Structures are given as C-alpha cells and as structure tokens.
Design a protein with these regions (language model features):
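Structured, charged N-terminal subsegments at the starts of enzyme catalytic cores
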Residues: 39-60
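Short, charged low-complexity intrinsically disordered segments located at boundaries
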Residues: 18-33, 127, 223-225, 247
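A short glycine-rich, hydrophobically flanked beta-strand micro-motif that places a catalytic Asp/Glu
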Residues: 22, 26, 31-46, 282-283, ...
Length: 330
C-alpha cells in the first residue's frame, strides 16, 4: 500500500504536507532510514475468529511503558509465568536499534531523544526507547524540542550546560508528529530534509512512516484488497446505508471521531483540535464489551515483526481517558 501511494503520487489525498514529500520519497528509497516501531489497533471478530484492522499508529505510537514493563510486572508480582504473555517488546526494540546502528555505520552512534515540553506521558514513553537504544550500543541523551538546535549545514545539536558546549548527534528520535512539523514548523521541515539527504542526520521514525500514519491508508488498502477479511470498508465519503466511523486523517487518541448510524445520524462523538482536517469513513465494527459496558481494543506492537500485545478499555470511542489493560494467555 505504501508503494502504491508513492508510485501514484497520492500524497495530497493522504493529507501529507507538500514540504515533507521530498523527504518521504528519499527515506522510502533508502533502507538506512529504517522504521523503528509502530502499533496496530485491532478489533476481534469472535464469529469469524479473526481480527479487523482499525488503524495503524506508525509515527508516534505510545503505550510503550504499559506494554513493555507494567503488564510484565503484573505477572511477576502475582507469581505468574512471564511466558504466559505475548510480550518481547523491549528485546525487539534493542535488536531493532542495533540493526539501525549497523545500517548507518558511517555515522556516530549517538542519539538524541526529544518530546514536546509539558507532556510527561510522552517523556515516560521515550524513557523506554532510550534504555533500548543504550543497550543496543548508542550514546543517548534527552532534550525537549525547544532545547534542540538545528543547523542546515552542520546537523543537530544539544547545548551542554555543564561545559557551555554544543553536543552534536547523528540520530534523532522525536515523539513529535511529522505532520505537525510539516504544517506548523515549515523551516524545520526544510532543514531536516537537507540534513537527512546530506547524511547529517537519521530521524526516527523516518518521514515515510507518514504513509501509514495517515488514516487514508485504510482507504488505499480497501481499494487494493476489497473485502479482505482483515479489513473494513473505508471510503472518502459517508456511507448512508451502513453504520460507519468518521475519522480525521491525522487525529490522535480518539479526537474528532464520530460514530454515524445508517441514515446519517451521529450517535457518538469526541471533540478535539483536528476538526479542520479531511476525513475518511470506516465501516463500523463493534469492539468486544464486558458486563460493565466497557469496550476493549487490542494494540499490537510491530518492531520488524509482531512482538507485543496490550489492550485499552473505555467507552464506545476510545479517547485519552482510556485505560490500559494487561493480558495473560492461558
């Protein structure tokens, strides 16, 4: 599906900012800019006994500490067998970082991790990745995005207050959405394009992950593989004869999602800051529900291969109030 988007120049349909297309094409064609990790959100079809793809979080997926550490600790603290859980997320992250380091052995294995300030949950997610990178042989550091300096000719730097010097890094992991950079930080998008193309910087996740972060990829998949048992019908326009879910192309945590009944009435919706974006309409599929009325959605982490499972519990639309739920395989 990603190749189809690139070959057919569907970037605008995907909602991808024009100023990121050059970097997307470049990183797509160069295997040294490998994808680090993503999370697939899935629903389970109990009748047909297979899963349905809800969406893919390819750029800035979270729930790392809950999946890698918390649910594993729950097993250990209760004296349960840790092998009764599908969870090798940390080990796979270490291996993937090591692979990326080897792909880029012409660069210094130094990586700076960054988030937006005042989002402590993002900082916790990044701490998991920092430990994995450290175990993979990287020198690691952290700085908020407003503390990072970018030079179009020299690279990426962090100020070291201890000796009043600037430290250069050849790798940068940002838990900051690519589309935010493209739309809101246009100068930074231009600088990053130059740095990446001139081998001054490797950015994780790479720019081509926007191909999968955009929910328009669900429409592309349906067009390529209509009625595939793992997919739900997805269209650019509302489906008046079928219950559906309206989603903006780059929304997060359930923001600006609506459930639309047959005939067009909205039965459930969550507000948010992404309302001016284009939408796709995905066939509604009921999530599994417990006796208290909570719904459950599976999150499957992918790091070169599927490697960990966790669940989120909440209402009809899972938003930023959803709770993480661990699992055990009997």
């Amino acid at each position: 599906a990603g190749r189809y988007v690139v070959d057919n120049h569907l970037f605008r349909e995907m909602g991808i900012p024009d100023n990121l297309v050059e970097m997307i094409r470049y990183t797509w064609a160069d295997e040294r800019h490998a994808h680090l990790y993503s999370r697939f959100d899935l629903a389970y079809d109990e009748q047909e006994q297979h899963v349905k793809l809800i969406e893919c979080n390819a750029d800035t997926a979270t729930c790392l500490p809950e999946t890698a550490v918390v649910q594993w600790a729950q097993l250990k603290s209760n004296g349960l067998d840790e092998n009764s859980q599908f969870n090798t997320l940390h080990e796979e992250l270490v291996e993937r970082f090591a692979h990326i380091r080897l792909l880029n052995d012409d660069l210094t294995p130094s990586i700076l991790f960054s988030t937006l300030r005042d989002y402590p949950e993002d900082d916790t997610n990044v701490s998991i990745l920092m430990e994995a990178a450290r175990e993979a042989g990287f020198d690691v550091a952290f700085a908020y995005i407003d503390e990072v300096d970018f030079s179009e000719t020299e690279g990426l730097f962090m100020h070291d207050p201890h000796n009043a010097a600037f430290i250069r890094f050849d790798f940068w992991f940002k838990l900051i959405p690519w589309e935010f950079i493209g739309n809101e930080e246009k100068e930074l998008a231009s600088i990053l394009t130059s740095l990446v193309k001139n081998r001054k910087l490797v950015v994780l996740n790479p720019a081509h992950t926007l191909l999968y972060q955009s929910k328009y990829i669900l429409k592309v998949l349906w067009d390529l593989y209509p009625y595939h048992p793992l997919l739900l019908q997805t269209e650019r326009h509302a489906m008046p004869h079928k219950k559906s879910v309206a989603k903006v192309l780059f929304g997060r945590e359930g923001a600006n999602v609506s459930i639309i009944e047959k005939g067009g009435d909205v039965s459930e919706s969550v507000s948010g800051e992404y309302g001016n974006q284009p939408r796709i309409y995905q066939e509604y599929f009921p999530l599994q529900t417990d006796e208290a009325g909570y719904t459950y959605q599976a999150g499957l982490f992918y790091v070169n291969e599927a490697c960990a499972l966790g669940f989120r519990r909440g209402g009809k639309i899972l938003d930023n109030t959803a709770q993480f739920v661990g699992h055990m395989i009997e």
